[in-house]
């Protein structure tokens, strides 16, 4: 067998980074393109990629190391933005290609901090690196083969663009590597010359590189000889298995798998001598009954292959199921805990033929308060949407909508938010307390973080305190809390009949002492996650829940009180009432973005918001979904022009919602 002889000298266009398991040239944005024997076009500034750096190598150390050869223009060790730790690679810029070539020839595969480094010309053309043209996979390498040895072994077959031996976290060879040539012809030449040859006393395999998806697809099409059989009777023996499968061809082995005590695990493997016999046995025996048990017989697969196949089947089934039930399957939530599958079916039976009906439950069997109902016709489902959404059942308003997969909902939300224009936020107003005029309870509550509260006279009506206009700050802190029914002062004067406002001097109101002011977050999360009536508050002062970081807000009302108030309120007032009850609950889950998340949740249907107030689990899920959307939208918004203030992240986030029905 031929022995591969590595040349004693070489002029290497050196290796680069492994991408998806393949050795590829490296690139860096914003750095001039270099060139050399690898065919990379040279620019005025020649940039070298330096890989496999020790994590302790600094910019200054890299600069000094490369300056020993030629004068360096600049260097950069790439680091993690969050932790500032080295990523194990960097870039060195020279003023001309001659200096860069000298550095490559002298320093490539040299040791820095006890670790061999790799150098290649930096290329910004990612298409060439990712195409896979000329890329080879080499396996069965001896542990002593490193990047330099592999490069020397293949350098006689053509111009090498990159070369890499895969290593573990300890730096030890994994026994395989990748070599990429500049042309496909050079790669084919290497396969013909080196495949099956011996390198460092081991026969190596050289073949075209295939990505994981391509390898798995090719494996599915390959013939097989090993057969997996399950659902065996506990009494089935190896000999019986061999006799049954032996009818279809020659068998090299047959075994029933057993545990440590020798008890059958009810599955086994049969290995045929040729794939045609194995395929015939699978076709004949799969699904056949033995000892009143139906056998499953199929190709023996690795765990990764089984998981991939199951994933494909699930995705295909979900896709087919989604198409099959489009417009027929309804999602119902805010169900009472006592509702069973039968009760849910009875509730919707009057609208048409129900093909399936299920209440979702946790592992302990407790209802999750939601379920699914599928009808035989789209017209029946449409009737349910029109008549049952918002209907009170068991003291709760039902939420009914067309069922959607999670991926579809998320895609819909992302598409919606990307088209929404940023909301305009008013500028900063005068530094003075603002009172809401007109009827009690007509103030607009805006859920944005503000400073300490001004004087806030309590107003009867819908159980909330008027708030500041966004951007305003109070001129002072503290003030008396008026009792219910007590008339609050008007700012600066009063109107007599239809005449003009007359100025009146008002008595200054005493400030509250610091020890009288509420401390920390004054609201409470109702017991069990449900909105329960609050107990009476002692004293003549009206307590105001107050957060040192946000606007003041009132204690959440019970479900009954809230439903009554909503029934008598205008749409604008309904939003404020829901916001007052929702904000404290959101703040306990995510205090940093509570204002933005609350605003997003308020864009949903009223029945769904009421469900969130009743169900901590549903609220947690929606808050998590809202936070994901905030993060995703914040990333593209940061790329906008600095001069376009309306496109700033804060403006974009202020305009978001997670209403599935917009």
Swiss-Prot record:
Keyword Nucleus listed: yes
Highest taxon above the source species: Eukaryota
Residue ranges of every copy of the RRM domain listed in the record: 46-124, 134-211, 225-302, 328-405
Domain PABC as annotated: residue spans: 558-635
Stretches with biased composition (Polar residues): 634-649
Keyword Repeat: yes
Mutant lacking the gene: phenotype: Pab2 and pab4 double mutants show significant growth and development defects and more resistance to Turnip mosaic virus (TuMV).
Family: Belongs to the polyadenylate-binding protein type-1 family.
Other notes: A.thaliana contains 8 PABP genes.
Protein name: Polyadenylate-binding protein 4
Organism: Arabidopsis thaliana
């Amino acid at each position: 067998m031929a022995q591969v002889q590595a040349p004693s000298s070489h002029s290497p266009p050196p290796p680069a980074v492994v991408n998806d398991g393949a050795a590829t040239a490296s690139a860096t944005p914003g750095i001039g393109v270099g060139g050399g024997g690898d065919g990379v076009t040279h620019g005025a500034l020649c940039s070298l990629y330096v890989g496999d750096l020790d994590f302790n190598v600094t910019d200054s150390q890299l600069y000094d190391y490369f300056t020993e050869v030629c004068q360096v223009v600049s260097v950069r060790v790439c680091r993690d933005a969050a932790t500032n730790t080295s990523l194990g690679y960097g870039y060195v810029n020279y003023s001309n290609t001659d200096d860069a070539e000298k550095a490559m020839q002298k320093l490539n595969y040299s040791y820095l901090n006890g670790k061999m480094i790799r150098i290649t010309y930096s290329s910004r053309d990612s298409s060439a690196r990712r195409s896979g043209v000329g890329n080879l996979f080499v396996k069965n390498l001896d542990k002593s083969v490193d990047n330099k040895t592999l490069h020397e072994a293949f350098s006689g077959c053509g111009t090498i663009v990159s070369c890499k031996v895969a290593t573990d976290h300890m730096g030890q060879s994994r026994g395989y590597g990748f070599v990429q040539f500049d042309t496909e012809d050079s790669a084919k030449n290497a396969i013909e010359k080196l495949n099956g040859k011996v390198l460092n006393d081991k026969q190596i395999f050289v073949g075209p590189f295939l990505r994981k998806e391509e390898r798995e697809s090719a494996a599915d099409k390959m013939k097989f000889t090993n057969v997996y059989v399950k659902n065996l009777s506990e009494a089935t023996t190896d000999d019986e298995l061999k006799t049954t499968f032996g009818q279809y061809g020659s068998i090299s082995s047959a075994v029933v798998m057993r545990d440590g005590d020798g008890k059958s695990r009810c599955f086994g493997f049969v290995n045929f001598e040729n794939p045609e016999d194995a395929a015939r046995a699978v076709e004949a025996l799969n699904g056949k009954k033995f000892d009143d048990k139906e056998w499953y017989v199929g190709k023996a697969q690795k765990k990764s292959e089984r998981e991939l196949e199951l994933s494909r089947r699930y995705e295909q089934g979900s896709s087919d199921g989604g198409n099959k039930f489009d417009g027929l399957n309804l999602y119902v939530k805010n169900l009472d805990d006592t509702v069973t599958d039968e009760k849910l079916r009875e509730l919707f039976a009057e609208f048409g033929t129900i093909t399936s009906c299920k209440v979702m439950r946790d592992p302990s069997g407790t209802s999750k308060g939601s379920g699914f109902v599928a009808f035989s016709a789209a017209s029946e489902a449409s009737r349910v949407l029109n008549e049952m959404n918002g209907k009170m059942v068991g003291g709760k308003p039902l939420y009914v909508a067309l069922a959607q997969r999670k991926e579809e909902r998320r895609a819909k939300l992302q598409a919606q938010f990307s088209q929404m224009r940023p909301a305009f936020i008013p500028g900063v107003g005068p530094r003075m307390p603002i009172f809401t005029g007109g009827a009690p309870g007509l103030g607009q509550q805006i859920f944005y973080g503000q400073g300490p509260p001004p004087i806030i006279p309590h107003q009867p009506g819908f159980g909330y305190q008027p708030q500041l206009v966004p951007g305003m700050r109070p001129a002072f802190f503290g003030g008396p809390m008026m009792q219910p029914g007590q008339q609050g002062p008007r700012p600066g004067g009063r109107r007599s009949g239809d005449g003009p406002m007359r100025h009146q001097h008002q008595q200054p109101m005493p400030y509250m002492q610091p020890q009288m002011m509420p401390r920390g977050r004054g609201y409470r999360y109702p017991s069990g996650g449900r909105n329960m009536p609050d107990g009476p508050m002692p004293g003549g002062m009206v307590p105001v829940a107050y957060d040192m970081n946000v606007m003041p807000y009132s204690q959440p009302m019970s479900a009954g009180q809230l439903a009554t108030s909503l029934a008598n309120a205008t749409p604008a007032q309904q939003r404020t009432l829901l916001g007052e009850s929702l904000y404290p609950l959101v703040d306990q889950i995510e205090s940093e973005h509570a204002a933005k998340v609350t605003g997003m949740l308020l864009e949903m249907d009223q029945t769904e918001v009421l469900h969130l107030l009743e169900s901590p689990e549903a609220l947690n899920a929606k808050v998590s979904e809202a936070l994901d959307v905030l993060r995703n939208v914040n990333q593209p918004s940061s790329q906008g022009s600095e001069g376009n203030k309306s496109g700033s992240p804060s403006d974009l986030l202020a305009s978001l919602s997670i209403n599935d029905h917009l």
